């Protein structure tokens, strides 16, 4: 399974993702420059965290116009796996690959800390190797992680089982206190209707090695590899 990790001007988590996929997961992985029209026959695409184009205008607002994102849209439309992490999630919403938007955190401050997220569905390639209801510890690092959408979109996400992760307590309770940024209904990650595109604010690549003190995030990448092996 070959992964492609996008690089935009201002990305800063691209090398982290590349390291985890190549050195920890032992998968073929390549960098894809933002001006590229070619995804180089990759089986899965990672839209990494950072500050693409300096977050000018809005987070992800300029990145959506880059040539590589046009290629990613076509790739996703054909069922290709795409995971957007933090700024990558913001880019996916701006690009129309996922509904809703990410606003400034409720407390108007940048937040960088470990959080707990509960697995809400295993009916997706990204979580097929996990258990519904289990809790993962994964760090966040964002200023605009407050997920919002209109009532109709929220109802659709629930009906179609597309809420993939929610912020929770260590024992899996969905509480106001467990929500770090004010995200509607504690949403930490969602997928598209085809279930092949995931956007999440927490950083699984920062929780993928013992040296980092957390390894739960690596299981998301393992699930992707396992799902592709079954195709």
Swiss-Prot record:
The active site is at residues 86, 203, 205. One of its GO terms (cellular component) is cytoplasm. The keyword Methyltransferase does not apply. It is found in: Cytoplasm. Its EC number is 6.3.5.3, 3.5.1.2. Pathway: Purine metabolism; IMP biosynthesis via de novo pathway; 5-amino-1-(5-phospho-D-ribosyl)imidazole from N(2)-formyl-N(1)-(5-phospho-D-ribosyl)glycinamide: step 1/2. Coiled coil: none annotated. InterPro entries: Class_I_gatase-like, PRibForGlyAmidine_synth_PurQ. One of its GO terms (biological process) is 'de novo' IMP biosynthetic process. Residues 3-231 form the Glutamine amidotransferase type-1 domain. Gene3D superfamilies: 3.40.50.880. It catalyses: N(2)-formyl-N(1)-(5-phospho-beta-D-ribosyl)glycinamide + L-glutamine + ATP + H2O = 2-formamido-N(1)-(5-O-phospho-beta-D-ribosyl)acetamidine + L-glutamate + ADP + phosphate + H(+); L-glutamine + H2O = L-glutamate + NH4(+). GO terms for molecular function: ATP binding; glutaminase activity; phosphoribosylformylglycinamidine synthase activity. Keywords: ATP-binding, Cytoplasm, Glutamine amidotransferase, Hydrolase, Ligase, Nucleotide-binding, Purine biosynthesis. Its main location: cytoplasm. Part of the FGAM synthase complex composed of 1 PurL, 1 PurQ and 2 PurS subunits. Part of the phosphoribosylformylglycinamidine synthase complex involved in the purines biosynthetic pathway. Catalyzes the ATP-dependent conversion of formylglycinamide ribonucleotide (FGAR) and glutamine to yield formylglycinamidine ribonucleotide (FGAM) and glutamate. The FGAM synthase complex is composed of three subunits. PurQ produces an ammonia molecule by converting glutamine to glutamate. PurL transfers the ammonia molecule to FGAR to form FGAM in an ATP-dependent manner. This is Phosphoribosylformylglycinamidine synthase subunit PurQ. The gene is purQ.
């Amino acid at each position: 399974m070959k992964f492609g990790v996008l690089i935009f001007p201002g990305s800063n988590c691209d090398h982290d993702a590349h390291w985890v996929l190549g050195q920890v997961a032992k998968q073929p992985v390549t960098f894809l420059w933002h001006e590229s029209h070619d995804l180089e026959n990759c089986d899965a695409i990672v839209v990494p965290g950072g500050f693409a184009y300096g977050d000018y205008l809005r987070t992800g607002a300029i990145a959506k116009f880059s040539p590589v994102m046009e290629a990613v849209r076509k790739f996703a439309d054909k069922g290709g796996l795409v995971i957007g992490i933090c700024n990558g999630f913001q880019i996916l919403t701006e690009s129309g690959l996922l509904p809703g938007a990410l606003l400034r955190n409720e407390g108007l401050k940048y937040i960088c800390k470990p959080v707990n997220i509960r697995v809400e569905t295993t009916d997706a390639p990204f979580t097929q190797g996990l258990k519904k209801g289990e809790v993962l510890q994964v760090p966040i690092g964002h200023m605009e992680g407050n997920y919002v959408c209109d009532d109709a979109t929220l109802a659709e996400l629930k009906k179609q089982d597309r809420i993939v992760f929610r912020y929770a307590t260590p024992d899996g309770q969905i509480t106001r206190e467990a929500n770090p940024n004010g995200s509607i209904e504690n949403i930490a990650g969602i997928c598209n209707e085809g279930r092949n595109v995931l956007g999440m604010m927490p950083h699984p690549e920062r929780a993928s090695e013992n040296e980092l003190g957390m390894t739960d995030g690596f299981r998301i990448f393992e699930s992707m590899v396992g799902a592709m092996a079954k195709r």
